[in-house]
Amino acid sequence: MNRSYPASSVKKNISKTVSEIAALVDGAAVGDAAISIYGVNRLEYAMPGEITFLSNPKYKKFLAQSQAGCIIIPHDFELGDEYSSRTFIRHENPYAAFVQLLRVFVPEKRYQEGFIHPSAVIGQLSVIAPTAYIGAGCVIGEECVIAGNAVLVGNVTLYDAVTIDENSILHANVVCYQETVIGSRAIIHAGAVIGSDGFGFHEVENGRFEKIPQVGNVIIGDDCEIGANSTIDCAFVGSTIIENGVKIDNLVHIAHNVVVGENTAIAAQAGISGSAKLGARNRIAGQVGVVGHLETAPDVIVHAQSGVAKSIQTGGHYFGSPAKPHGEELKILAALKHLPELVRQVTELKKLHEKD
């Protein structure tokens, strides 16, 4: 299917010369440094007047066909004669330089300080800072506290006694149950649900389940980011805790009484079962499952689709289900490829033995 792509969806009427950009990112211009740049784009779609970058060698194939006005490349990247008429910026870390430029050419949306939309509903005894922004359709329960420069974009629902600290932003349709605490500079993406009941049921007679009250809350620290449609359950008692600097992708589930250590990152579709405790700086890849009531050490990296079935005492790479040290699991997988031939050989040996 043929599909056309816009030259750029991120132009913001900002113009800088390549020379200015090179100075801004502490790089070295190669070629026509007087070219004006108006936007940013991916290498394969960038057009004249846009800047892009190349850091991963596997994307080198797009370099010749790119129409970008300027390309940020590594210091040691070799340019052939065919690029003598092109403009580049050499940089020790092209990706980091490009990220810096995103903030220049695509500045973050600024919300009007001290704005409360007429359609917002605010409960009794709630305190909203004079510089906060409350968008259309927001419902704020009783005794909530919303600190300075906090933003509730629209249709956000806060149950009673929720606290949102300064400079945090809750995107559309976020729901925070009662007594949720969100720290400073947090970003909660659309559709996330914070503080819903944990999966707590007691089996009684005839296999029937009886609900166990979930009376705790969720505490999210400073500088955290929670992805779209992710869910973090409240504690059975006490608190489910997301420590400072944690980054959670879309469609992640965090169960009741979990503790996620500081600066941990959890990728999409991972699930952390109740009362598990993840150490600081863990890296949990996509579709990882973590059994409840276990602990992981700091600096643990769990590879995609692994199942963590017991506590991990030492930092390092883990893979498989149940998760094992990465190198050990790779050896097992390599051995499995030889299993059919081993079975055949054993069968032949058994036949020979039976003849004897």
Where are these regions (language model features)?
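Structural signal for interior beta-strand "rungs" in well-ordered beta-sheet cores
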Residues: F53, F115-P325
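Terminal amphipathic alpha-helical/low-complexity segments used for targeting or macromolecular assembly
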Residues: M1-S119, T180, R185, G191-A192, ...
